[in-house]
């Protein structure tokens, strides 16, 4: 996906000169003449193929100028992100998002709300790294999307106000303000936003199993969930320029997120076609969370920018309390049993404390050779407690010791890395290696058993990048890349506390999960700014995947390690101007993925299956008079395999109309999932059971976004924090 880049040199009067230099031209036999200025008219390339990443420049195309960052990501065909925060890059999941190299410490709807709070006009570029270099954390099998902002200001005040509201079946809004004030040595920045996101889930699920040789058991389930999230985001930052070469910055980030959910669940149990009993459950869930993080950053740049030194000190505190009240009424059929009621109350506090330090050193040794090196050290501690009460009457509940648990884990992570980059004629090569040592101390207390253990792990993560530029002027090049990645278990997925959707449907973490290792290889041909085609190969070991377990009437979702997952994909990006004001962009991918696992003592999952799939994204961008643009997006994918689960084909259509009143003021009208076709149909095939489900969510949304910016911008250097990789595990 890219735009052709046309450059035109134009002579303009000196009175129109802005931030340009006069140029002297001399030809033999002619007098010297001064051209007041040479102005390059036309955009920079929208997509720039660098050695280890693809750089998207939103300012090079009006399709990416209006709205917010969430809308910009949705306008890039190789990226897929929805309102729930599910994200993929080139068809790969497990993607990390960073802002100016810093982790956001957000996932799901909280991440979506934060991206919507960043106006598109503040974006400098977006770096897409399917295989990040050694400098970046090895966390995340799907790669990294680094959003780079125009961050500093000139002397004076710069601010931004954004207002957004949308409605499907339920209302949503996201409003905020950011301010930056710059002085000679000091600069202060702050931002504040409030948001509300609401959704509903209508689920129709059918479970079929044979838990004995002669009985065919069917459970029909209808779920209706409605949730809303009230979110408050705040940031304060202070930067002091020590001298021309060094600066120090202190920043504080705060998040408060209050999640509430009401669920109604109806289950009908039948054996050999005869209805046996029915249950009706009502769940009231509250899950408030708080996050505080502090970062101290030091930056030094040597003369002529031939060397640079950076240090980061970080602290993060994350806490949540999941509380649930579940009421179930059981009605037996054709039985002497009486109608029964059961009440369940659960309280599950969870907390994470992280402390980290990171240092980076860069040195340009010669015109064609440069190197980088650095270190990272983290200590993180997470703990949770599961407390449950049961009873047949709400006022007479007693502790349920069979569900009680305590989980505590301390992790130490130390890492060092180095990168070497060399240019040889048409070749550009980058070699790197990252060494990580991790130590885990885990303590789990159940009513029936206690588990204490210590695990140590050392891994090397090599990276290799090479690009051969066939024709410099045309932009044709061949690129090859290899890298090893790691995906550590999500903290909540280690949490052994049980969450009940209803008495027969639950989710439970797995404290025995191991880290997932992935080997990634990419081969790509780039044909200038018009199109590129690539081959991607991935080999996962101990792949972390959700699995489904069914025993009699009880259905449990949890996570397990799958011994081996292999995938191969061919993908293509393109961008073409059809007429003067009409652009077409596209991304297509054909992929084969295969899962294989043999049961062991700790993992009883048996799976050996693969599937071919196709996905495509197509976008049309139309420029209209009066600085208006229309974006029409279509996406389609065939069956997708996730371990035991096959997700059926899915099609979506989106439309956006943008009006740019000035460089500072814009208004965007958006319509997502116009035909409400985002209906998730799943087929889960397990050992002795089949599950079929259909889920409808609040995906057809009409929104209006207003953005106003005032003040001056100035580019700031990219900074990375020491606690990379932790965001995806919160």
Predicted features along the sequence, with ranges:
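Surface-exposed extracellular loop regions of Gram-negative outer-membrane beta-barrel proteins
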Residues: 148-163, 202, 206, 220, ...
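Short acidic/polar hinge/loop motifs at secondary-structure boundaries
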Residues: 69, 75, 103-130
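Transmembrane beta-barrel wall of Gram-negative outer-membrane proteins
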Residues: 170-202, 214-263, 290-294, 464, ...
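Extracytoplasmic beta-strand/coil segments of soluble accessory domains associated
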Residues: 47, 70-107
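N-terminal periplasmic accessory domains that precede
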Residues: 69-72, 111-113, 128, 140-162, ...
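Outer-membrane beta-barrel signature, preferentially recognizing the C-terminal barrel domain
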Residues: 405-411, 486-535, 539, 557-569, ...
């Amino acid at each position: 996906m890219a735009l052709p880049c046309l450059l035109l040199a134009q002579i303009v009067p000196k009175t129109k000169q802005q931030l340009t230099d006069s140029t002297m031209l001399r030809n033999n036999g002619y007098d010297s003449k001064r051209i007041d200025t040479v102005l390059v008219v036309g955009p920079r390339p929208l997509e720039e193929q660098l050695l280890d990443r693809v750089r998207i420049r939103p300012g090079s195309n009006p399709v990416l100028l209006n709205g917010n960052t969430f809308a910009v990501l949705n306008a890039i065909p190789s990226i897929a992100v929805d309102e729930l925060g599910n994200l993929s890059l080139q068809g790969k999941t497990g993607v990390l998002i960073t802002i100016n190299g810093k982790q956001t410490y957000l996932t799901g709807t909280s991440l979506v709300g934060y991206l919507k709070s960043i106006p598109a006009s503040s974006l400098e570029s977006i770096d897409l790294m399917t295989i990040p270099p050694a400098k970046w954390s090895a966390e995340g099998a799907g790669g990294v999307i680094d959003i780079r902002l125009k961050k500093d200001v000139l002397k004076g005040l710069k601010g931004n106000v954004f207002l957004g509201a949308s409605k499907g079946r339920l209302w949503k809004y996201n409003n905020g303000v950011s301010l930056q004030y710059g002085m000679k040595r000091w600069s202060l920045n702050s931002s504040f936003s409030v948001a509300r996101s609401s959704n509903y889930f209508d689920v129709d699920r059918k479970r079929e199993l044979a838990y004995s040789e002669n009985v065919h058991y069917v459970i029909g389930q209808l779920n209706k969930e409605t949730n809303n999230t009230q979110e408050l985001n705040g940031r304060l930052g202070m930067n002091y320029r020590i001298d021309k070469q060094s600066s120090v910055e202190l920043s504080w980030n705060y998040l408060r997120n209050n999640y509430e959910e009401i669920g109604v669940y109806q289950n009908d149990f039948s054996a050999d076609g005869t209805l046996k009993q029915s249950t009706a459950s009502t769940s009231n869930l509250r899950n408030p969370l708080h996050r505080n993080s502090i970062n101290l950053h030091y930056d030094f740049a040597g003369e002529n920018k031939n060397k640079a030194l950076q240090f980061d000190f970080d602290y993060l505190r994350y806490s949540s309390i999941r509380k649930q009240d579940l009421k179930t009424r059981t009605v037996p059929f054709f039985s002497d049993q009486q109608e029964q009621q059961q009440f369940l109350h659960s309280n599950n506090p969870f907390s994470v404390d992280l402390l980290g330090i990171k240092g980076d050193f860069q040195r340009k040794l010669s015109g064609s050779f440069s190197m980088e090196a650095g270190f990272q050290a983290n200590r993180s501690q997470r703990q949770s407690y599961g407390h449950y009460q049961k009873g047949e009457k709400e006022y007479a509940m007693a502790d349920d010791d069979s569900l009680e648990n305590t989980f505590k884990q301390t992790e130490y992570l130390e890492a060092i890395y180095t990168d070497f980059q060399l240019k040889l004629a048409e070749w550009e090569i980058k070699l790197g290696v990252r060494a990580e040592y991790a130590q885990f101390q885990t303590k789990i207390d159940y009513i029936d058993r206690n588990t204490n253990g210590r695990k140590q792990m050392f891994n090397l993560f090599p990276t290799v990048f090479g690009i051969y530029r066939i024709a410099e002027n045309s932009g044709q090049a061949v690129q090859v890349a290899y890298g090893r990645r790691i995906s550590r278990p999500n903290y909540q997925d280690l949490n052994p506390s049980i969450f009940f959707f209803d008495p027969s449907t639950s989710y439970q973490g797995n404290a025995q999960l191991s880290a997932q290792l992935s080997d990634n290889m990419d081969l790509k041909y780039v044909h200038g700014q018009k199109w590129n085609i690539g081959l991607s190969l991935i080999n996962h070991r101990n792949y972390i995947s959700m699995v489904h377990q069914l025993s009699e009437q009880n259905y449990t979702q949890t996570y397990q390690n799958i011994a081996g997952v292999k995938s191969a994909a061919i993908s293509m990006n393109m961008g073409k101007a059809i007429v003067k004001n009409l652009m077409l962009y596209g991304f297509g991918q054909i992929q084969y993925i295969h899962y294989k696992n043999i049961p062991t003592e700790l993992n009883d999952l048996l799976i050996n299956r693969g599937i071919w799939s196709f996905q495509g994204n197509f976008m049309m961008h139309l420029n209209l008079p009066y600085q208006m643009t229309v974006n029409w997006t279509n996406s389609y994918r065939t069956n997708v395999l996730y371990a035991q689960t096959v997700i059926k084909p899915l099609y979506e259509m989106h439309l956006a109309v943008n009006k740019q009143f000035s460089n500072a003021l814009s208004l965007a009208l958006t319509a997502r999932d116009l035909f409400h076709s985002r209906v998730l149909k799943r087929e889960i095939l397990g050992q002795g059971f089949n599950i079929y489900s259909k889920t409808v969510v609040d995906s057809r949304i009409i929104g209006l976004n207003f953005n106003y910016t005032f003040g001056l911008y100035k580019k700031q250097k990219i900074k990375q924090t020491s606690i990379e990789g932790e965001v995806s595990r919160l």
